[in-house]
Amino acid sequence: MDDTNQFMVSVAKIDAGMAILLTPSFHIIEFPSVLLPNDATAGSIIDISVHHNKEEEIARETAFDDVQKEIFETYGQKLPSPPVLKLKNATQTSIVLEWDPLQLSTARLKSLCLYRNNVRVLNISNPMTTHNAKLSGLSLDTEYDFSLVLDTTAGTFPSKHITIKTLRMIDLTGIQVCVGNMVPNEMEALQKCIERIHARPIQTSVRIDTTHFICSSTGGPEYEKAKAANIPILGLDYLLKCESEGRLVNVSGFYIENRASYNANASINSVEAAQNAAPNLNATTEQPKNTAEVAQGAASAKAPQQTTQQGTQNSANAEPSSSASVPAEAPETEAEQSIDVSSDIGLRSDSSKPNEAPTSSENIKADQPENSTKQENPEEDMQIKDAEEHSNLESTPAAQQTSEVEANNHQEKPSSLPAVEQINVNEENNTPETEGLEDEKEENNTAAESLINQEETTSGEAVTKSTVESSANEEEAEPNEIIEENAVKSLLNQEGPATNEEVEKNNANSENANGLTDEKIIEAPLDTKENSDDDKPSPAAAEDIGTNGAIEEIPQVSEVLEPEKAHTTNLQLNALDKEEDLNITTVKQSSEPTADDNLIPNKEAEIIQSSDEFESVNID
């Protein structure tokens, strides 16, 4: 109690929870009102004493120290252990790492990461249950530095760094084999092979470090695990191949699945072959009959070819061998000549085909002496060229029609009578019909002249312009055109219809010209509805006709009629041609009017080249 202090104070004011006390020296003291006596009011004088309680103080300090020691012993002495990283397996391109279970003590885990060359490459998921990791895609024969870092609430704890080097291709110690369904003999061979190549011990279950799954047949739980883990499923021959070559080989040709599918396909093919064996035996027994029939058909098909070849060869041998000798007689008609040459060409093309039996003509040639040399025949070469031209002309539809007409004419005409005499006989029988049709032609000519007169009245100015242009064109015309115009004018000066004698003479000349110029007429295109207004005879065809003396050359003049009127006149003339059943050739040069000038030439409107007369209309 010696340490007790006692003093007297007076209460100045009492508020809620707080009292103001005054000391004798007039110091103000704030004192809790709860500690005042219950009957104390403002102005009351009270005594206050204070002392130090050391015993209680020591007891409390001792209790506090005990609690601190207990906490330290529980949470402060056992820290988390750093992870221990180890190598499980290393191959040419992969490394498998493993570590011991983590010792965290009382700390909580934050993360577990794997570092390669001080770079984080993998964050381990479920670190409390996962104790290994596999890194693939590494380089051959290369060193790598790995470490595992543990992060907890008690701090960060890294593992020791380990250096691992990948294997070379000739190092087979990294092979880790897991076996599946194995035949006992193959299992023994596998164990011996593993010992010879110093590979890792054989596993019976698929693990993270398994590199190859070896089995004799597919199926089983371990087979499915290996398939899910993308582990190559191979046969025993793969390890034997690696052992024989002393290096790691490619696995593409040793998959057990491909081998199983091959065996299945082979079994299926064997079954199908066995099923098809019986029908094939029956077919072979019936084969001689079929071959005999085929041989008979082939012999019958080749018989006509042999006869034609013999005929052509005999005709060729009959011809003179020297070019200076007199040539043989030509065929009666050009059509017959083209047929003979084309057949000869067909025989040559057939003889050039391989793998065909030699014909009788070839046997005859083989019997001839080797010293005999065949000389060139110019007449035969000309026949071949004509046949080629004739075949090219026959490819067009127009030429095909004309060739059919010519063939019919040659069949109907007797070869002993000349063409001109036969035409005259036919025309003498048809003279009454031609006399009746001349009146209809004159009516058509009068209708055409009336149309021309109507157009002259409406287009006077255009006629003057066209006369100037036609005069300029006449100055530039060639001498051949001037001669042709003079021939037209001489024909225009003739008056009155032609007599029967002239008609018969012209028909005879036209038929003779048609017979002599079959090939020229074939070259001329047929008139159709589309090109009837624009067709023009080629100058070459006109010159050929003039040289033969059958029909005189008619000049080409412009058309004065409008397109519609000209078309109507052409239709009328075509109708007359069909009724007369005569060969009429319409020669017309059409000029379409342009926007700049209404071209109405001051020339002949239309000239009709016929086998019985030449008609024309002259416009001044």
Swiss-Prot record:
Mitochondrion is among the record's keywords: no
GO molecular function: protein dimerization activity; protein-macromolecule adaptor activity
Family (UniProt): Belongs to the CHS5 family.
Protein name: Cell fusion protein cfr1
Biased composition annotated in UniProt, kind: Basic and acidic residues: 382-392, 517-537
The organism of origin for this protein: Schizosaccharomyces pombe (strain 972 / ATCC 24843)
Keywords: Golgi apparatus
Domain (Fibronectin type-III) ranges: 79-169
